[in-house]
Structures are given as structure tokens and as C-alpha cells.
UniProtKB/Swiss-Prot annotation:
<feature type="binding site">
    <location>
        <position position="255"/>
    </location>
    <ligand>
        <name>S-adenosyl-L-methionine</name>
    </ligand>
</feature>
<dbReference type="GO" id="GO:0005634">
    <property type="term" value="C:nucleus"/>
</dbReference>
<keyword id="KW-0808">Transferase</keyword>
<feature type="binding site">
    <location>
        <begin position="210"/>
        <end position="212"/>
    </location>
    <ligand>
        <name>S-adenosyl-L-methionine</name>
    </ligand>
</feature>
<dbReference type="InterPro" id="IPR047266">
    <property type="entry name" value="KMT5A-like_SET"/>
</dbReference>
<keyword id="KW-0498">Mitosis</keyword>
<keyword id="KW-0678">Repressor</keyword>
<dbReference type="GO" id="GO:0032259">
    <property type="term" value="P:methylation"/>
</dbReference>
<dbReference type="GO" id="GO:0005694">
    <property type="term" value="C:chromosome"/>
</dbReference>
<keyword id="KW-0156">Chromatin regulator</keyword>
<dbReference type="GO" id="GO:0051301">
    <property type="term" value="P:cell division"/>
</dbReference>
<keyword id="KW-0489">Methyltransferase</keyword>
<dbReference type="GO" id="GO:0140944">
    <property type="term" value="F:histone H4K20 monomethyltransferase activity"/>
</dbReference>
<comment type="function">
    <text>Protein-lysine N-methyltransferase that monomethylates both histones and non-histone proteins. Specifically monomethylates 'Lys-20' of histone H4 (H4K20me1). H4K20me1 is enriched during mitosis and represents a specific tag for epigenetic transcriptional repression. Mainly functions in euchromatin regions, thereby playing a central role in the silencing of euchromatic genes. Required for cell proliferation, probably by contributing to the maintenance of proper higher-order structure of DNA during mitosis. Involved in chromosome condensation and proper cytokinesis.</text>
</comment>
<feature type="binding site">
    <location>
        <begin position="282"/>
        <end position="283"/>
    </location>
    <ligand>
        <name>S-adenosyl-L-methionine</name>
    </ligand>
</feature>
<keyword id="KW-0158">Chromosome</keyword>
<dbReference type="InterPro" id="IPR051760">
    <property type="entry name" value="KMT5A"/>
</dbReference>
């Protein structure tokens, strides 16, 4: 290998060997020197990115000492006295910075509260939205409102004076009658007609093929009292004896009507001639009247009631109810 340029020997770290850069005074923290005099005493920028809330100068002194010692070991060219002085100055600066940066917990709480005051309107809006989004709370409030409304209405009703019906309509006697009242009045009317013997709305007339009969002289409504089948009220033993006597005379007709009352058989004997029209009403299976018992003072009376509406001029008829062979042979008109 040929001879060339001589390689410069590395410096021994002395101050005289280092060329002057044109700056006077100590080294600047923001502009460190290039030739091995970098002290690296500045704040590492990585801490600001890792924890933004912490101040860069809030590092503990022990960490600073370790970093200083580490940098000192990397810079063997600097004398130890200068590095120690710079380390002490840096410690003082860091301690003063930590005192300023570290705030008491009370101040932090006050700052948080002040920040919260600025954020209160937004939080209130979010709270309102949350309340709107929750249907159960709205339902409960709605139910409370609904419950309050009837109470208010009841209070208003209680305050209003009570009005009587007589304040609007005059007092008058009611003309309406109950069913029992109507029935009792009808019974009294029939009792009076039976006891007095009045027979109104009919007359006796001659009917072809039958002889005497009764014709209606007025209209009768269904269920209305027509006439009483008047005669002698006798028991069955007396009725049988009289019937045997009447059978001996062919000119005497049979006007005897048998019925049961209180589990006992009775008979109305209307054979004797009287002026009562009930005994002259003729027989028919499809008559417009029917018989009915009427009690007056526990004494049964046999009356005729209209089975349907009867017009003026119609003959009054009812079914005798005798279906015996002897009766049918003696009186063939009973078949009709």
C-alpha cells in the first residue's frame, strides 16, 4: 500500500484540541455543540406525546440524575466539574419547574369544576335527550298527570252546588201504575160486577139450529171479563143426585158445570130458569171465550173471559169440555 495522506489522530478529549466554533460563553441548551460536547440535558420530547397532561419538567429528580450520569458517561471529553455544575443548575431549574407545574388537588378540582361549568349546557341537552329516550319515565309522568286530572275534576264537582230535580221540573203525581196495582183494580171491578149481577155488553138472541144464544153488543178485548156463569154452588154428591133427577124429565136441559177447587170437586147448577145470560151461552170447540175461577172471600165463582178480541154482533161461545159417550149420544151438538 502506497503512502498517502496522514490520518489525523483522534483527540484525547482536551479543550485545547477542540476547534472554536465562534461562539463565546457556555453551551446553549437548544443548540448543543457537535464535537462530543453534547450534554443531552434538555427534556426528551417523547414524554409530551406519551402523557399530554403531565408537564415535561415534572420528572422526578432521581430520573434526572440517572439521565445526567448516563450522558456524562457518553461524553468523556468534558471535565467532571463542568458537568456537575451544569447538573446542579439543571436540578435547581427542574425543582423550580416542578413546584410551578405541580398543582394542589384543590386547584385541580376547581379547574375541573370550571371546565364542567362550560360543559354544563351540553350535558343538560344530553340529559334531556336521555330523558326523552326513556319511555318508562315519560309513562310514569303521564300517569301522574292523568291521576291529577280526575282529582281536579272531582274537586270542581264538589265545589259546584247540587241541584234538585224539582228546581227544573214541577212536582206532579205520577199516573203510572204497576202490574199488581192494575190487577188489583181489575179484580175489584169484577167483584163488583159479580156481586151486583150486572151483565153489560151482550144480549140474548135466537140462533138458527141452536135456539137461544148470546150476542155481543160491544167489543171485548182479549183477557177481558165477559160474564159470570151464575148458578147454585154445590158439592159433587149433591150434583150427582140432582143430575139423576133431571135425567128423568126429557124437557129439562142440563146446565151443570163441574170443576175442582182446592183439591175438591164442585158444581155450578144453572138449570133453574133465571134472567142471567151466562147460562145461555152455547157450546163450541173453537169458542171465543173460556172459563176461569174467580175467588171472592174464599168462595169460587165461575166466570167467562174473552179468548181473543170479540167484535160487535159475534155470538159468545165456549167449550163445555164434556167428552163422555152418554153426553155425546144425548147431545150430538157437543161434537162440534
Amino acid at each position: 500500500m502506497g503512502r498517502g495522506k496522514k490520518m489525523s489522530k483522534p483527540g484525547d478529549g482536551r479543550s485545547g484540541d477542540v476547534p472554536d466554533t465562534g461562539r463565546t460563553g457556555g453551551t446553549n441548551e437548544n443548540h448543543p455543540k457537535i464535537n462530543g460536547e453534547v450534554a443531552h440535558l434538555g427534556q426528551p420530547k417523547i414524554y409530551s406525546f406519551m402523557s399530554p397532561t403531565k408537564s415535561p419538567s415534572a420528572r422526578p429528580p432521581l430520573q434526572e440524575e440517572n439521565s445526567v450520569a448516563h450522558h456524562e458517561s457518553k461524553c468523556p471529553g468534558k471535565p467532571l466539574t463542568e458537568t456537575r455544575k451544569k447538573a446542579e443548575v439543571e436540578k435547581k431549574r427542574i425543582s423550580s419547574g416542578t413546584e410551578l407545574s405541580v398543582k394542589p388537588s384543590e386547584q385541580r378540582e376547581t379547574e375541573c369544576n370550571s371546565i364542567g361549568e362550560f360543559l354544563d349546557p351540553k350535558q343538560e341537552q344530553t340529559d334531556v335527550r336521555r330523558n326523552i329516550a326513556l319511555p318508562p319515565a315519560d309513562k310514569l309522568n303521564h300517569q301522574k298527570m292523568v291521576k291529577d286530572k280526575p282529582l281536579r275534576r272531582k274537586a270542581q264537582r264538589k265545589k259546584s252546588p247540587n241541584r234538585k230535580l224539582t228546581d227544573y221540573y214541577p212536582v206532579r203525581r205520577s199516573c203510572r201504575k204497576s202490574k199488581t196495582e192494575l190487577e188489583s183494580e181489575e179484580k175489584k171491578r169484577i167483584d163488583e160486577l159479580i156481586q151486583t149481577g150486572k151483565e153489560e155488553g151482550m144480549k140474548m138472541d135466537m140462533i138458527t139450529g141452536k135456539g137461544r144464544g148470546v150476542i155481543a153488543t160491544r167489543d171485548f178485548q182479549r183477557g177481558e171479563f165477559v160474564v159470570e156463569y151464575h148458578g147454585d154452588l154445590i158439592e159433587i154428591t149433591d150434583a150427582k143426585r140432582r143430575e139423576a133427577t133431571y135425567a128423568q124429565d126429557s124437557n129439562t136441559g142440563c146446565y151443570m158445570y163441574y170443576f175442582q177447587y182446592l183439591n175438591k170437586t164442585y158444581c155450578i147448577d144453572a138449570t133453574r130458569e133465571t134472567g142471567r145470560l151466562g147460562r145461555l151461552i152455547n157450546h163450541s170447540k173453537s169458542g171465543n171465550c173460556h172459563t176461569k175461577l174467580h175467588n171472592i172471600n174464599n168462595v169460587p165463582h165461575l166466570i167467562l173471559v174473552a179468548s181473543r178480541d170479540i167484535n160487535v154482533g159475534e155470538e159468545l161461545l165456549y167449550d163445555y169440555g164434556d167428552r163422555r159417550k152418554s153426553s155425546l149420544e144425548a147431545h150430538p151438538w157437543l161434537k162440534n
